[in-house]
A protein has these predicted regions:
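GIY-YIG nuclease catalytic motif and its immediate N-terminal context
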Residues: 1-37, 43, 50, 57-68, ...
Length: 89
């Protein structure tokens, strides 16, 4: 099982990170221990959304989709209430 996930920075609320992994718990720990170049600047991070995929190819495609404008719109609709409460929308 592979996971596509969305992280939110606790130090900069409007900073979101999209990625995919096979081990979601371990990956979150890595992000919070500053082991990822893209996320070490805005630690700590919290998991706000994830989807499970049956294989790596599907997870990678879903991650790429979430990184384009149409995919971002879908995420914003799914997370609308949460993002509104966080004053991001």
């Amino acid at each position: 099982m592979f996971y596509v996930y969305i992280l939110q920075s606790l130090s900069k609320k409007d900073e979101l990170y999209i990625g995919f992994t096979k081990d979601l718990k371990n990956r979150l720990v890595e992000h919070n221990q500053k082991q990822n170049f893209s996320t070490k600047r805005y630690t700590p991070w919290k998991l706000i959304y994830y989807e499970a995929c049956l294989n790596e190819i599907d997870a990678e495609r879903r991650e790429k989709y979430f990184k384009v404008s149409q995919g971002r719109r879908l995420l914003r609709r799914r997370l609308k209430e949460y993002l509104y409460q966080q004053k991001i929308l």
